[in-house]
Amino acid sequence: MAAGQESEKNNPFRQSVHQQLSGWGLYRHFFKRLFDICISFVALACLFPVLLVVTVWLYFANKGAGAFFLQDRPGKDGKIFKIVKFKTMTDERDASGQLLPDEQRLTKVGKFVRSTSIDELPQLVNVLKGDMSLIGPRPLLVQYLPLYSPEQARRHEVRPGISGWAQCHGRNAISWTEKFKLDVWYVDHVSLMTDIKVVWITIKKVLKRADINEAGHATMEGFNGTN
């Protein structure tokens, strides 16, 4: 009898189920999503006037190229979804038809929208739909998927977020390797307190406009599997 009880106690499946249904496991698998829905809905309602003004502002600044940017991104378990962001660059091209460098296409309005992180606000729609969470690893480009190591790929075990643990510790000013380590740390430590801490640090960084991009670049250098 004692041996049977010990076997049940050491059963990894039963332990994982218990962890999911208690403590922070319950937050991770139920309350986190509930908070995402409630907060994103209220935020969209409150911020609607701001979103409307920025939409019109960017439409004219982008010379008719539109105010929104939609792109395929991998979400939880690698499932592809359309991310929504404010468009901060024009579609201007050179004589051969190639897009001009990012630095030349980034408008003054777009630069302001980026530096204040306003460009991320439309992702509240993705959060409401369930594609994303308020807090989690940032959703990156689809072409990065085959470049991840097995450990780095663990970042897709949770929904991607508007902000995350990596954004609190350097954002675009740290290497990809460092960023992925921080992402995986978050996956292993999802909790209400961690998410509250991320929100607090994110607000402070946004107000200070800290760690927006690497010095001298409009966008961060792409991931190549080794950097």
Task: Go through each PLM region and give its residues.
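C-terminal terminal-structure detector
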Residues: A2-E6, S22, E157-N227
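A short, structured surface patch at a secondary-structure boundary
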Residues: D102-R159, V199-T202, V206
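Positions in alpha-helical segments
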Residues: S40, F69, T107-K111, Q143, ...
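Short, hydrophobic secondary-structure boundary micro-motifs
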Residues: V54, F68-F69, Q98, I135-P137, ...
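A hydrophobic, helix-centered structural microdomain
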Residues: Q19-D91, V198-N227
